[in-house]
Amino acid sequence: MNTFEKWDDQRTDLASSVTQQHAYRRGPRITAIETLVPHDIMPGLLAIRVHVQDADGRVWMGHGETYYVPTSVASVIHDFFSPRLLGSDALAIESHWRFLYERMIAFAGTGAELRALSAIDLALWDLAGQIHQEPIWRLLGGPVRDSVPVYNSSGGPSYGRSNKQVPGASGWPGHGDPGKQGPLEDNWASINQPVELAKELIDLGYRGMKLWSFDGVYRRQGGQLLTARDIDEGLAPFRQIRNALGDQIDLMLDGHGFFSLGVARQIARAMQEVRPLWLEDILRPDCIHTMVEFRKSIDVPVAVSEMLVTIDAYRRVLEAGAADMIMIDPTWVGGISGTRRIAELAQAYNVPTLMHDCTGPMTLLAGLHIAGSNTGVAYQETVRAHLATLYPHLIDTELRVESGHLELPMRPGIGASWRADLFDSKHPGYRRSDSGHR
């Protein structure tokens, strides 16, 4: 009895039901799922490989990822998702996505569960592209452009790493890591040498830079009440860049959701003089009414927010008019399948989409595929330090910014593979599920 006959003998549901409860099983079958937490490179990352075989014995491997609480996400994949996925049709992407999304949302599973779905979805889209010999953006209806405009966000090689790896690091992504002086440490340089950093980015072809200049104020003062001196401190790098370089580079501010409504207004009104392209997450998106009040009371564009992870959360923001643009992380909202839904919804409101990446190479590639197939995407975030120092240790493809753009991936699938040496079965962060074990 071959592998396909064994699966057919074990499961009689050859096709999906209208509820998607039974996975469609007539195409290339999922034979194994591997996950890895690369603690020594990016400890917050979960890398995934999905193995597939068709009836003629041909094999493929799909690649995906997500970021944050990776061990918990791996448990969701292996302990909950794998019984549905193993032996099922790898190309039944919508069936898998709809069933797993509805099961997770039914019990408020918008953390590790939605990240797990995102990682699986990326891998399945990668497989679809490989099997059909097309890049994902082509399967999504693209191209709508040949390359995607990018900006640099103020992370560094030490961003998001533990304080065991980098002494003094907070170990909490998005929590105001000050960085340290050194090559590519843009979180440090954006505060201490902002003009020099801006010049360097312009020379490298970047069109924009996002600063985290109020994070230090928050670490010292908290976010409930700031003085005029505090506001001036956070504004200083922006003023220095504008005074030295004028409008040669777009400037944005990420507030990481640290501030109260009153303080957020103070910051926004002070920022008007430096003409930012947008303000991002100056306050948390917890209350839609507060977000609307904030946007209506200022004259600076507002971006909201990779802190949102469900389609319904973005819908409420768009319906209420709480944002001038939305930011999406593809590996937090349900993968390619979730991201394209949200980006297309935003188009109905004439609100542009921004793609997030501080989180991993497959996240960045997924954003490029969405941008390559959706005219509403305006900008792709990058962290040049990650492109230069971390991503080369993870994937087999170089991602190079040229003239402020990244080219659309032309390779079939997502456009890269995990480095083969990452998935060592003896690695402490490795897990595998297949038909024999989980």
Regions found by a protein language model. Name each.
Residues D79, P83, S95, R269, ...:
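Shared catalytic-loop signature of beta/alpha-barrel
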Residues D40-L45:
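Short N-terminal binding/cap micro-motifs at the start of the first secondary-structure element
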Residues V18, D56-H132, R138:
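Metal- or metallocofactor-binding catalytic centers and their adjacent structured scaffolds
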Residues I30, V59, F81, I120, ...:
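Conserved, mostly hydrophobic/aromatic
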Residues P135, P149, D250, P301, ...:
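Proline-centered loop/turn at the N-terminus of a beta-strand
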Residues N2-Q20, R25-P38, I342, C358-R438:
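Flexible C-terminal active-site loop/helix
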